Amino acid sequence: MAKEWYILHTFSGREARVERAVRMLVEHARIPTNVIFDIKIPEELLTEVKDGKKRVVRRKFFPGYLLVEMDLPEVDWRIVCNEVRRIPGVSGFLGSSGNAKPQAVSADEARRILQKAGEIKGDRTPRIAQTFLVGQQVRIVEGPFATFSGEVEEVMSERNKVRVAVTIFGRATPVELELVQVEAL
């Protein structure tokens, strides 16, 4: 067999504890080191704006799931899977009811998940947690138009920007701003 990524289902909020427990199984030789190679909690960076302050936080984008890179043996796969399933907080492997060998995630899907988590090369810029709707009233908190209010005309989420119609001298003027420069009213 070759190394493949599998998805381990856990109780939500127990991901870090389960990750440590799986690493301990390998460290204490309950599972051979040539079977489990890596384990990841799929997280992404988000920029939150709270009380006018920006901060970058880590958020799980698949709560209750871990990615485990394994080379499951053809013969003794049940032993390995049962050891992992015995960990408190583990529900089981995705694609396996317990009697069948777990299904590996396709290489493309694993690459996309790891890329989104920033584990492999790709866009690692923090995503903005705040979203706006067209027509929503906002206040500009940063930049030359700070303290002005306006109405959202367009949301460009892929560029983390928003176009706001600001009334200056009695005329609505469109202004393109970063998402972190505005807050909802």
Curated annotation (Swiss-Prot):
It comes from the Bacteria. InterPro entries: KOW, NGN, NGN-like_dom, NGN_dom_sf, NusG-like, Rib_uL2_dom2, Transcrpt_antiterm_NusG, Transcrpt_antiterm_NusG_bac_CS. One of its GO terms (biological process) is transcription elongation-coupled chromatin remodeling. This is Transcription termination/antitermination protein NusG. Keywords: Transcription, Transcription antitermination, Transcription regulation, Transcription termination. Signal peptide: none annotated. Coiled coil: none annotated. Belongs to the NusG family. GO terms for cellular component: cytosol. Participates in transcription elongation, termination and antitermination. It comes from Treponema pallidum (strain Nichols). CDD domains: KOW_NusG (cd06091), NGN_Bact_1 (cd09891). The lineage of its organism: Bacteria, Pseudomonadati, Spirochaetota, Spirochaetia, Spirochaetales. Residues 134-163 form the KOW domain. Gene3D superfamilies: 2.30.30.30, NusG, N-terminal domain.
